[in-house]
Structure formats: structure tokens, C-alpha cells
Regions:
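Generic alpha-helical secondary structure signal
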Residues: 9, 14, 66, 70-73, ...
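Catalytic donor/gating beta->alpha subdomain of glycosyltransferases that bind UDP-sugars
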Residues: 26-89
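Membrane-embedded multi-pass helical conduit in multi-pass membrane proteins
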Residues: 99-182
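A recurrent flexible, glycine/aromatic-enriched loop bordering the glycosyltransferase active site
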Residues: 1-17, 21, 30, 36, ...
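Membrane-interface anchor segments at the N-terminal boundary of transmembrane helices
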Residues: 87-98
């Protein structure tokens, strides 16, 4: 695969001159220091490159609860980065919090439907509010598709993948919303 220009890269390799000119990582950030440095590189006219030929060794969290805590904390700090740098953040950083809001709205609507509360509503309103389930259903279908397409994984790995992926997205999104609300 060919190298390509990117907006940010984790585990980046930088020339010494980058730090001499732009300074080091922003130590006031507990997460996202790499993204912030990549932003300064781009704003100074530099380029960030992604090369699939480069490899790093990464040790993931040993337990599922620790993974959830990690992604929650990362979401909290991403909200701080959004607060500091606003529109310079990619739209993809808003997908996990929108997922959390969408799933929450879907759950509220489901409870209202199951308790019969929506029966008193006009038919057009019931139909309209039922549309709130579409994004959650699409997300669930995407997870099922990702698990299904994991050709090199056995059944156990696929089951974990089906649990871990939404756990990462939801915990990150919930952390982001908390970080946005509490500053």
C-alpha cells in the first residue's frame, strides 16, 4: 500500500527540527497530545504522512473494563480538544457522542412505545418518532457486518470484537459528552 497524506497520526515519527521550531507536546493535555502536535505541524505548513509499511508495537488494555475506562477518559479529553480547537477537529470525532445521543433517544422512544404512552399521540407523530430507531439499527447492522467480515478471526474473537467495538464507541462518546458538559 502507498503512503498517503493524513490529518494526524498516532505513534508519529518526527524530525528533530519539528520540535525545535514548534515546541514539544502540549503537556496540559492528558490525551490527544499527538493530534495537537500534528495540528501545529499542518498549520506551520508541514505535512503529516501515513505509511502502512511502518509498524509499532501496541499493548492493548488487559481487561474489558480497563478498555472501557481508557476510552471514556479519551472521550473526556477529546471534548477538551474540541473546546480548544473548535472547527479544526474532524467531523469523525463527533460520531461517538452522536451515537450515544441516538441510542439514548432510541431507548427512550422504545420505553414510551412499550408503556403505551405513544398510543395517545397522533399517528403521524408516532411514525415520525419511530424513525429515531433507524440510526441505532444502522449502527447495529454495521457492527454485525464488521464481525461477519472478520475472516481471519475465530468464533471467540468475533464475539469479543462484537462486544469491544461498541464498548469503545459508546464509552468514548459518553466520555465526550461528560467532558463537554463539565469542562
Amino acid at each position: 500500500a502507498a503512503d498517503e497524506r493524513g490529518s494526524a497520526t498516532a505513534h508519529g515519527v518526527f524530525r528533530r527540527e519539528v520540535f525545535d521550531v514548534l515546541g514539544s507536546f502540549d503537556e496540559t493535555l492528558r490525551r490527544g497530545q499527538d493530534w495537537e502536535l500534528n495540528l501545529r505541524v499542518r498549520e506551520a505548513g508541514g505535512r503529516v504522512w501515513f505509511s502502512p509499511d511502518l509498524q509499532v508495537t501496541y499493548w492493548p488494555r488487559a481487561t474489558w473494563p480497563n478498555l472501557v475506562k481508557q476510552f471514556y477518559a479519551t472521550g473526556v479529553w477529546r471534548a477538551e480538544i474540541v473546546r480548544r480547537y473548535g472547527a479544526r477537529n474532524s467531523a469523525r470525532y463527533f460520531a461517538p457522542p452522536l451515537l450515544v445521543l441516538g441510542v439514548t433517544a432510541s431507548l427512550v422512544e422504545a420505553v414510551l412505545q412499550l408503556t403505551g404512552t405513544t398510543r395517545r399521540w397522533p399517528r403521524f407523530l408516532r411514525g415520525f418518532t419511530s424513525l429515531v430507531h433507524v440510526p441505532s439499527a444502522a449502527y447495529a447492522a454495521g457492527i454485525v457486518t464488521a464481525v461477519w467480515r472478520a475472516d481471519d478471526a475465530g468464533l471467540r474473537e468475533r464475539m469479543w470484537f462484537g462486544l469491544v467495538l461498541p464498548s469503545m464507541h459508546v464509552s468514548w462518546g459518553a466520555g465526550f459528552l461528560r467532558g463537554l458538559a463539565t469542562g
